[in-house]
From Swiss-Prot:
Keywords: ATP-binding, Cytoplasm, Kinase, Nucleotide-binding, Transferase
Residues engaged in binding ATP: G8, I9, P10, G11, V12, G13, K14, T15, T16
Main location: cytoplasm
Keyword Flavoprotein found: no
Sample GO molecular function, one term: ATP binding
InterPro entries listed in its UniProt record: Adenylate_kinase_AdkA, P-loop_NTPase
UniProt EC number: 2.7.4.3
Family: Belongs to the archaeal adenylate kinase family.
Location relative to the cell: Cytoplasm
Catalytic activities: AMP + ATP = 2 ADP
Lineage, highest ranks first: Archaea, Thermoproteota, Thermoprotei, Sulfolobales, Sulfolobaceae
Name of this chain's protein: Adenylate kinase
Domain of life: Archaea
Keyword set includes Translocase: no
Amino acid sequence: MKIGIVTGIPGVGKTTVLSFADKILTEKGIPHKIANYGDYMLNTALKEGYVNSRDEIRKLQIEKQRELQALAARRIVEDLSLLGDEGIGLIDTHAVIRTPAGYLPGLPRHVIEVLSPKVIFLLEADPRIILERQKRDNSRARADYSDTTVINEVIQFARYSAMASAVLVGASVKVVINQEGDPSIAASDIINSLM
């Protein structure tokens, strides 16, 4: 099984690109699964009785959060292993999380060593395009990313973080541009890099 971690700043179009990847892999008859890391963390936290809602996760003690991250990573790998040798697992997450206290790595050692991806993908687009996409998406609150300078900074920190994580497991890091108007190009690029 080949695992790719797909990261991207809010508004870059990660969900859309991954839905195109799902469609392409289905059409090709390739066993695959797209695992949303945040959903696995929530489901694990609920199952373990740590929280009653998603908002409670960030209020947990740091050690409890680290334990939760590792448990979620193990569950993802367990699920992806069911795909067999020819399967492709794509993990939807963030390389960094921007917080008021600074940037948190999205793929710290205790997570990346469990996931052990072949490739860490950085889905990117021009910051002005990301800003326009954010303005069109009323379903999400992204005021903390509503400036091209901030978007550029987050993209740079994501690159640093992805490379630091990749070093720990011998993965490659690939920047994939999500072209405005045709997310299938980025989806195909991700799939082809894992074949």
